[in-house]
Amino acid sequence: LVSIGFILLNLYFVVKKDSLIVNALPVLLGVFLLALFSFDKLIWFVAFFAPLSLPLSEIIPSFSFDMYLPTEPLLFGILILFLLKVIHERKFDRDILLHPVSMAIYINLIWIFLTSLTSTMPVVSFKFLLARMWFVVCLYLLTAKIFKSGKKMEQYVWLYLIAFIVVVFYATYRHWGYGLFNKQAAHYVVSPFYNDHTSYGAAVAIYLPFSVLFAFSKVYSWKFRRVALVVLGILVMAFVLSY
C-alpha cells in the first residue's frame, strides 16, 4: 500500500506539477532513519558529500536565496535532531560541553546573537547565526564525540578525500583544456564545487598533512601506504595547479 501510494503521488507531481520532488522522499526518509539510529553515519554522509556539494543557484538560478546541496540542508536537519535528542535525553558529554574551546565558541555565538539584534540587516545576521550553529553542532560537538575513537577520525578524513579527489580530477581536466600553465583558468575551473582557486587550494592544503601521515607512517600497512602515496601525489599536483 505504501509503495502504491508513493507511485500515485509521484505520478501526480510528474503529470500535474511537472516536478520530480517526490523522488526525494525515500532519500529524506533514509537520512531521517540514519539520524534517528546513528548520528555518526549521518556525519560520514556529510563528510563525503561536502566536496561534491553544489550551490542551489547552479540548479535553480531564479531562486532568491542560495545554499549548498545536499550538505547545508543536512546540517540544518542534524542541528534540529540534535537539539531534540538533547532535550529528550537531557544529557551530552560534559567534557566536551565544558571544554575551554567550547566556552570560547559559546561566547562567540552569544556575541553574534547580540550584534544580530542591533544589525541593520537582522535577517541576514540571524541566518549567519543559524549557519554558525549548525556548523558548531555537526562539525564540533558531534565530531568531537565521534573522534574519541582515532579510527573514526581516519574514516572521516578518507571519506572526504575520496570525494575530493573526484573534484581534483574534474578541475584538472577542465584546466587541461585551457592549458595547465594558465593561471587565470585556475580561478574558474573549480566551479561549481568551489567559488575560486583560493578556497580550493585551502582545502588541498588542509588535507595534505593527513596524506603525508598516511603515506609515511609505519603504523599503517605497506598496501595502505601505497594508496596514500598515490593520493598524496594527486593532492600535490592539485596544490601546484591551484596557483
Go through the PLM ranges and name each one:
Residues 54-63, 118, 181-193:
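Juxtamembrane membrane-water interface segments that cap and precede transmembrane helices
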Residues 18-21, 64-74, 128-132, 193-207:
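Membrane-interface micro-motifs in multi-pass membrane enzymes
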Residues 120-136:
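Alpha-helical transmembrane segments and their immediate interhelical/interface regions
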Residues 32, 126-130, 143:
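Hydrophobic alpha-helical transmembrane segments of multi-pass membrane proteins
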Residues 142-151, 241:
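Transmembrane alpha-helical segments of multipass membrane enzymes and assembly factors
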Residues 1-113, 124, 148-158, 214-227:
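Transmembrane signal-anchor hairpin modules in multi-pass inner-membrane enzymes, especially those
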Residues 49-50, 131, 163:
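Transmembrane alpha-helical core residues of multi-pass small-molecule transporters
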Residues 2-10, 27-32, 79, 105-117, ...:
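Alpha-helical transmembrane segments of multi-pass inner-membrane proteins
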